[in-house]
């Protein structure tokens, strides 16, 4: 009898607690759904939906994909979409956010020799010497891909050619010496950057 009375007393309290927990979780759930919907809009090039989502919650611009960990900025960089890149930057997209492998939008641009995109990212203070999980910088990736125009741009913006990776303990300069028989990349690396090296510690929207 005592147990039955006790249960009758506790049950309503338990229901209230569960309800309160669900209520507390709902904002986080709503943000997750909103972020995923925003990334889908970016992937589908739906400027209207993306803009509306950011009007509701401006922080969604830096949402990371639940599986890949990449942001909208990485998505549009990989498809070499300068219009969307400028739009996202104007909305406060953070170019330093990396995916699960530590790859940043600037690194994607370096691999693709997407110079226009890299320039936009660097103008937005993308860390030029940030490393991925292998310890590779954007400059190392550009040298490995033999993307001369990208090497020139990164060096111009103060990239450190002597920063070694974790995998082989080699720097961009080392890779250039080993792999570039023409000497072109090494010459670009030895060129002086414009101005002081970067501190690493009205825009049109998409149509």
Give short role names for the model-derived ranges.
Residues 34, 68-69, 102, 135, ...:
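Start-of-repeat signature of ankyrin repeats
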Residues 40-45, 75-81, 108-114, 141-147, ...:
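Ankyrin repeat A-helix N-terminal signature
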């Amino acid at each position: 009898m005592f147990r039955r009375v006790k249960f009758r007393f506790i049950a309503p309290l338990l229901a209230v607690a569960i309800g309160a927990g669900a209520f507390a979780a709902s904002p986080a759930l709503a943000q997750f759904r909103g972020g995923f919907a925003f990334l889908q809009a970016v992937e589908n090039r739906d400027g209207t939906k993306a803009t509306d989502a950011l009007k509701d919650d401006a922080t969604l611009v830096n949402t990371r994909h639940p599986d890949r960990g990449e942001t909208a900025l990485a998505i549009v960089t990989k498809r070499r979409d300068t219009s969307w890149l400028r739009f996202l930057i104007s909305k406060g997209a953070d170019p330093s956010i990396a995916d699960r492998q530590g790859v940043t939008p600037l690194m994607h641009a370096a691999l693709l020799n997407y110079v226009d995109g890299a320039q936009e990212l660097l103008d937005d203070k993308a860390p030029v010497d940030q490393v991925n999980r292998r310890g590779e910088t954007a400059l190392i990736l550009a040298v490995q891909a033999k993307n001369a125009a990208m090497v020139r741009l990164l060096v111009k913006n103060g990239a450190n050619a002597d920063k070694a990776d974790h995998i082989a303990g080699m720097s961009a300069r080392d890779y250039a010496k080993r792999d570039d028989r023409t000497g072109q990349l090494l010459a670009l690396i030895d060129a002086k950057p414009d101005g002081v090296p970067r501190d690493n510690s009205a825009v049109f929207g998409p149509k």
